[in-house]
Swiss-Prot record:
This is Protease HtpX. One of its GO terms (molecular function) is zinc ion binding. Keywords: Cell inner membrane, Cell membrane, Hydrolase, Membrane, Metal-binding, Metalloprotease, Protease, Stress response, Transmembrane, Transmembrane helix, Zinc. Zn(2+) binds at residues 139, 143, 222. The chain crosses the membrane at residues 4-24, 33-53, 158-178, 193-213. It is an enzyme of class 3 (hydrolase). The keyword tRNA-binding does not apply. Its EC number is 3.4.24.-. The gene is htpX.
Length: 293
């Protein structure tokens, strides 16, 4: 319910902004409606295709292998731990995958709660004790139980639509202003080269600004997943796991995977562009119980 409410409120806000832009620019609502439909198709289409293909894309990205039958005691423990925590969280048992990487990391993905995937790096199993590993797995199970992948897709779709629509509207105005020799009543986008160039530049600029919104949500959901892990296995285990992450190698996963991993890159010039909060902030949030209410 919270996810749907957030989606509806975000769409309402976007529609209000669209209305203001149309009023200020004087663009006909009929042409704007067509553009809005096109922007929505592209904006949500790309986001939902990525969601539907997320498991296969993620496995291919890290070279992961789904564990069908455990080959050793460690894989058996991993499957049993995921199964037990999935039952606690009241979700269907996810597929479990293992991938080779020196860093301590894990991620969850999938289009639905009952068709999800939890993947763990070999570095995690080699460098964490069982309590710490349990906490990391519980963190990923919490992402699935919270529906974070779907919510992220909805937000990304709205943001994509907003970026495409506003960029094309402003590009149309710029092209019309810079074109010469047009009749006063002539319709169209003006100079096509100007329209294309301006729209591409604006999509890039607005895309960077829009990423601040999606990355804020990504950081926000990490706090809640940490809290979910604390509820499943205990606060001290999750704190110990986060402290262990401080000693990890810099994550090796592709940039497109960072939002789904427990351990994100911290080498950015601003926290605004981080997919994960700093580890110290996550530990402090657990100790204060800010997200455990």
């Amino acid at each position: 319910m919270m996810r749907i409410s957030l989606f509806l409120l975000t769409n309402l806000a976007v529609m209000v902004v669209f209305g203001i832009v149309l009023s200020l620019t004087g663009i006909q609502s009929s042409s704007a409606a067509g553009l809005m439909i096109m922007a929505g198709l592209f904006g949500f289409g790309g986001a939902f295709v990525s969601l539907l293909m997320s498991k296969s894309m993620a496995l291919r990205s890290v070279g992961g292998e789904v564990i069908e039958q455990p080959r050793n005691e460690t894989e058996r423990w991993l499957l049993n731990t995921v199964r037990q925590q999935a039952q606690q969280a009241n979700i269907t048992m996810p597929q479990v995958a293992l991938y080779h990487a020196p860093d301590i990391n894990a991620f969850a993905t999938g289009a639905r709660r009952d068709a999800s995937l939890v993947a763990v790096s070999t570095g995690l199993l080699q460098n964490m004790n069982r309590d710490e590993a349990e906490a990391v797995i519980a963190h990923e199970i919490s992402h699935i139980a919270n529906g974070d992948m779907v919510t992220m897709t909805l937000i990304q779709g709205v943001v994509n639509t907003f970026v495409i629509f506003i960029s094309r509207i402003l590009a149309q105005l710029a092209a019309g202003f810079m074109s010469s020799g047009r009749d006063e009543g002539e319709s169209g986008n003006g100079n096509p080269l100007v329209y294309f160039a301006v729209s591409m530049v604006l999509e890039l600029v607005f895309g960077v600004l829009a990423s601040i919104i999606t990355l804020w949500f990504s950081r926000h959901r990490e706090f809640h997943a940490d809290a979910g892990s604390a509820r499943l296995v205990g606060r001290e285990k999750m704190i110990a796991a986060l402290q262990r992450l401080k000693t990890s190698y810099e994550p090796q996963e592709a940039s497109s995977m960072m939002a789904f991993c427990i351990n994100g890159r911290n080498k950015t010039f601003s926290e605004l562009f981080m997919s994960h909060p700093p580890l110290d902030k996550r530990i402090e949030a657990l100790r204060s119980g800010a997200y455990l209410q």
